[in-house]
């Protein structure tokens, strides 16, 4: 029994949700899209997928998970909208659908859907996008296994407000032509169209995300990637090894990527880009939509982590990599010279006990470092940054923090108008494009 078969037997979610689809012969990958109140936008996402070559579409099953919680928890208008989405999808699958969506099916899109919306099929009260993704990915994994795709099958996660490029499926397939390919994040770039206030907010949000990744890279963290749910790709084997998609209402992408990084390697796919929408949303407690909404409501300042926090993180990781033979007390004492709060944080995490145990149980340096980063994972990294935020390195204005990190990376754009950046949308856009390009260069 391989890892995928074991996962499907022991951990995969099934009842009461059922995959509605046509023939599955020849399917090698699946694109899973959770959809909540997306009747107006889902066709745009499906059309962007349908613009991929017919030969690529023949290998791919597109699974839309129409989901909401029960009445009284979910909004009545969202439930009604979801029923319209289900009607649309079922019509497309049955006979090509209404005129507005017929082009999608004529292009060769292989469509499937899951009803996690109707009475008796709703998500539980604490369910959310994480569970919706899990339901879809588990169902897709089962279909891929039945189709004979095996552990090399590929699972792609995106969103119903996200547009993909015409080479999306090909770029992912080419990446997974390498047998060792485990997990990856496709390049992303939020669309900078729409209402001015929303565009301004998403400009700042994506800059914050890329600022954070730049700081993590400067610190040499193995968790230096953006956690954007619409970008995640993994092999069937990796999905099973990671224990499936995290079920959280938000942050599911963060925890799932962390597990993928602990069990293998998270790479970058630069050959194509996905384009999330710059829209506000109340549906999740954090993430792009919530950040944009809070910014519009005046509850979100333009701030990000203090650059010194990444310097302290880098000091810790340097000590670990340069002196793996050292006693934990020496590591803590040296770290305290850079930041006493960081050393105290590690003490609260029982660092000394963990360090000694890792040294005893690791046969070589490679295993030791891998085990250390499984312990000091993305979540502990974030907890350290939050601890430093609360003990001497408070959140900093976004634009000045970006400048500091770019200076440290020796990647500051030439002759850039930093002094007037806060009120200059054109310059902010240019800065974001610079950060996007820098991220591509650093992960090639």
Residue ranges and their predicted role:
Residues 8-10, 71-152:
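Active-site-proximal specificity loops/subdomain of glycosyltransferases
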Residues 248-255:
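Acidic donor-binding loop at a coil-to-helix junction in glycosyltransferase catalytic cores
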Residues 138, 150-175:
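Acidic donor-binding/catalytic loop of UDP-sugar-dependent glycosyltransferases
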Residues 163-203:
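Conserved donor NDP-sugar-binding/catalytic core segment of glycosyltransferases
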Residues 1-6, 293-444:
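Terminal low-complexity segments of carbohydrate-biosynthetic enzymes
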Residues 213-233:
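A recurrent flexible, glycine/aromatic-enriched loop bordering the glycosyltransferase active site
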Residues 29-38, 52, 65-68:
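A conserved hydrophobic helix/loop-capping motif in glycosyltransferases and polysaccharide synthases
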Residues 21-25, 45-59, 68-72, 81-95:
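Short, acidic, metal-binding catalytic loop of nucleotide-sugar glycosyltransferases
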């Amino acid at each position: 029994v391989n890892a995928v078969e074991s996962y499907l037997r022991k951990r995969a979610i099934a009842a009461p949700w059922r995959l509605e689809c046509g023939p599955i012969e020849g399917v090698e990958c699946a694109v899973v899209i959770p959809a909540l109140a997306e009747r107006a936008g889902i066709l745009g996402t499906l059309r962007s997928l349908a613009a991929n070559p017919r030969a690529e579409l023949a290998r791919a099953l597109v699974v839309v998970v129409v989901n909401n919680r029960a009445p009284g928890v979910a909004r009545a208008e969202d439930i009604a909208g979801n029923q319209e989405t289900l009607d649309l999808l079922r019509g497309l699958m049955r006979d090509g659908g209404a005129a507005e969506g017929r082009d999608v099916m004529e292009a060769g899109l292989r469509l499937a859907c899951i009803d996690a919306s109707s009475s008796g099929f709703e998500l539980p009260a604490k369910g959310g996008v994480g569970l919706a993704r899990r339901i879809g990915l588990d169902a897709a994994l089962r279909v891929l296994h039945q189709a004979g795709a095996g552990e090399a099958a590929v699972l792609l996660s995106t969103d119903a407000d996200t547009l993909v490029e015409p080479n999306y499926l090909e770029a992912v397939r080419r990446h997974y032509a390498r047998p060792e390919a485990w997990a990856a994040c496709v390049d992303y770039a939020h669309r900078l169209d729409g209402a001015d206030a929303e565009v301004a907010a998403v400009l700042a949000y994506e800059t914050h995300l890329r600022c954070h990744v730049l700081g993590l890279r400067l610190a040499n963290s193995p968790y230096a990637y953006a956690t954007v749910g619409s970008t995640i790709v993994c092999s069937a084997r990796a999905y099973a090894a990671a224990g499936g998609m995290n079920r959280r209402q938000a942050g599911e992408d963060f925890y799932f990527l962390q597990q993928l990084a602990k069990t293998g390697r998270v790479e970058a796919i630069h050959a194509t880009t996905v384009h999330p929408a710059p829209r506000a949303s109340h549906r999740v407690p954090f993430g792009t939509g919530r950040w944009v909404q809070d910014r519009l409501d005046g509850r979100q300042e333009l701030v990000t982590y203090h650059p010194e926090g990444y310097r302290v993180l880098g000091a810790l990781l340097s000590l670990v990599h340069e002196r793996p033979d050292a006693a934990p007390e020496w590591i803590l004492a040296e770290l305290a010279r850079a930041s006493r709060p960081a050393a105290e944080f590690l003490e609260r995490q029982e660092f000394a006990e963990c360090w000694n145990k890792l040294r005893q149980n690791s046969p070589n340096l490679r295993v030791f470092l891998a085990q250390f980063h499984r312990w000091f994972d993305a979540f502990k990294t974030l907890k350290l940054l939050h601890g430093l935020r609360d003990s001497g390195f408070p959140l900093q204005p976004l634009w000045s923090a970006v400048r500091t990190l770019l200076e440290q990376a020796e990647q500051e754009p030439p002759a850039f108008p930093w002094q007037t950046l806060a009120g200059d949308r054109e310059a902010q856009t240019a800065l974001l494009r610079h950060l996007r390009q820098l991220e591509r260069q650093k992960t090639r």
